[in-house]
Amino acid sequence: MKVLAVTGYKPFELGIFKHDDKALFYIKKALENRMIALLEEGLEWVLISGQLGTELWAAEVAFSLQEEFPDLKVAVITPFLEQEKKWSEKNQEQYEAVLAASDFTESLTHRPYESPVQFKQKNRFFIEKADGLLILYDEEIEGSPVYMLNEAKKAQEKRDFPIYTITMDDLRVTVEECSFYEE
């Protein structure tokens, strides 16, 4: 696997409203654990659309892993221009920092938001270009990542397309493991 698309919940879908929420440590640790395993198998690119939450956190994790895995690259391909326009200043700063540190940035439609079709186009494009999907999602907790997941499941009908899921149970295990090692 060379290219991994990453998506998942937005912060509000997880009840996270602060950039220093303790839960972020565990979410990032779970993302890191999955990415390291894939890096050891040849992962080269992490592909995100720059959405708040899981995607930006995954980019931050990838940047931290670049010390150990210098060939790892991050691409941010947004569904439309100015997606951050209505975000808070703090969220815009995080987004701009990720864009600045990324190896490749582009907008899929080269236009501002027009309709939900742009999100559908982005989901199809990501699944078409990626070799697999890492998704922070739990079937029991509906949310925005379901659209990318459904697109990935369609791809699985036609080709080998692994979906690596981080569920709430996986996060609980991460918390327990981290707590065990802290003791």
UniProtKB/Swiss-Prot annotation:
Taken from the record, one Pfam family name reads: YpsA
Tell me which Gene3D superfamilies the record gives.
3.40.50.450
Q: Family per UniProt?
A: Belongs to the UPF0398 family.
UniProt-recorded name of the protein: UPF0398 protein BLi02355/BL05236
Q: Which organism is it from?
A: Bacillus licheniformis (strain ATCC 14580 / DSM 13 / JCM 2505 / CCUG 7422 / NBRC 12200 / NCIMB 9375 / NCTC 10341 / NRRL NRS-1264 / Gibson 46)
